[in-house]
Amino acid sequence: MGCWLKQPQGITTMMGCWLTKSRENILDNVIVTDAKLKISMNFEDCAKKIRKVACQFEVKSCITDIDDQKVLVSGDFNLHKLVKTLKKKTGKKIEIVTKNEKSSEDKVDDTVQNEDSKDEIVPQNADKPETSIMEVEFDIPFLCEKYEKDFGKVISKCTGVETYVVDLENKKVVVIGNFDKDELSRKLNKKMHQKIKKAEKERQEWESEMMLREAEEEKRLADIYEEIDKDRNVSLNPITDYEKEMAKHYYMFSDENPNACSIS
């Protein structure tokens, strides 16, 4: 008893270490189905390194979003060990935004005895709807920087969407979350047809404007040629005294021989 009283600080330290190890042991046994992490990523090399580390664990997919600094991991894996390894390999601070732990009830089934004295297995989660994160890729032929925000609004309003990545170069969008992909596909197709109609209308308006400009230019040139012909006719066939006087000042040269004598 005297020893316990003389060294309370050492005992406290030992107790704290024991609690820390116990907590880590508990976390090591926790399996999650999906998690969203916040990690600072400046370049694609950082994202590749994170995906490479995640592949060492039992993960189904690892999606990195450099713009939002988010990493979405799905599968049956140990989140505590994954985060610990990522911190060690990257040296970056990692924040767990969301996580879904795998319930132990999903593996335990109840045994019920029926009227024939036979055992029947009844799953615990038979009435529970399955909620899983999925990754769906949508091809959008008319996707460009001009329409990126419009399609982004459609995706963001869809229920169950966690995040999405726009690939302008390959004309596609990768959407991640627990959502109705058929409904989202219909909405994206509707928005795409709207953009096609708008682009067609803009093209027709542009063609009409160009035709109008060409007509105006042709009319302007016709007026110029008409004025030139009128002046030439006056110089060749003067009628009034004024035209006869003005005709004296005109000099006409032959186009065939510019060095020929002039007619005045």
From Swiss-Prot:
The modification Cysteine methyl ester is found at residue 261. Keywords: Coiled coil, Lipoprotein, Metal-binding, Methylation, Prenylation, Repeat. It comes from Arabidopsis thaliana. Probable heavy-metal-binding protein. It holds the Pfam family HMA. Residues 185-218 form a coiled coil. InterPro entries: HIPP4/7/8/17/18/19 (IPR044577), HMA_dom (IPR006121). Residues 32-95, 133-204 form the HMA domain. The gene is HIPP17. This is Heavy metal-associated isoprenylated plant protein 17. It comes from the Eukaryota. GO terms for molecular function: metal ion binding. Residues 262-264 form a propeptide.
